[in-house]
Amino acid sequence: MATRGFSCLLLVISEIDLSVKRWV
């Protein structure tokens, strides 16, 4: 189902958010 892709997307978003906070 789409739940697997959604969780993967959330994981990627959280990782990007962490890297953004690191850069700022």
Swiss-Prot record:
Pfam families: Humanin. Its main location: secreted. Keywords: Cytoplasm, Secreted. GO terms for molecular function: receptor antagonist activity. GO terms for biological process: negative regulation of execution phase of apoptosis. It is found in: Secreted; Cytoplasm. One of its GO terms (cellular component) is extracellular region. Belongs to the humanin family. Plays a role as a neuroprotective and antiapoptotic factor. This is Humanin-like 11. The lineage of its organism: Eukaryota, Metazoa, Chordata, Craniata, Vertebrata. The gene is MTRNR2L11.
